[in-house]
């Protein structure tokens, strides 16, 4: 016996991928996520390829995973995919200390983030508009 299947939270023309434990602050990750929101998947991949941000490599990997999920798991056409949503969440925060003057210490926060990308298949006419 197994658990009953859970209802699919996405529409039939959508697929998603989640990247967790990304070692960057959510604020910096959101700058890169804003680049790809609402863009066609191929254009978003090209933008990430030539972005100078360090975290763009991990965002590109997550987007490629979402595209692969759409193609292999949900039988969607890769050429008609659009980045419907790209949102950032908080992860854990490692707390470290740095030595300061006069024998004191200061806190250093090392934040982690998570990224969720949802791609949606749209018709060719709607994507061109």
From Swiss-Prot:
Molecular function terms, GO-annotated: rRNA binding; structural constituent of ribosome
Organism of derivation: Bradyrhizobium diazoefficiens (strain JCM 10833 / BCRC 13528 / IAM 13628 / NBRC 14792 / USDA 110)
Top-rank taxon: Bacteria
Name of the protein this chain belongs to: Large ribosomal subunit protein uL22
Gene name linked to the record: rplV
Lineage: Bacteria, Pseudomonadati, Pseudomonadota, Alphaproteobacteria, Hyphomicrobiales
SUPFAM superfamilies in UniProt: Ribosomal protein L22
Family label: Belongs to the universal ribosomal protein uL22 family.
Function of the protein: This protein binds specifically to 23S rRNA; its binding is stimulated by other ribosomal proteins, e.g. L4, L17, and L20. It is important during the early stages of 50S assembly. It makes multiple contacts with different domains of the 23S rRNA in the assembled 50S subunit and ribosome. The globular domain of the protein is located near the polypeptide exit tunnel on the outside of the subunit, while an extended beta-hairpin is found that lines the wall of the exit tunnel in the center of the 70S ribosome.
UniProt entry keywords in alphabetical sequence: Ribonucleoprotein, Ribosomal protein, RNA-binding, rRNA-binding
Gene Ontology cellular-component annotations: cytosolic large ribosomal subunit
Matching HAMAP family: Ribosomal_uL22_B
Subunit: Part of the 50S ribosomal subunit.
UniProt keyword annotation of Amino-acid biosynthesis present: no
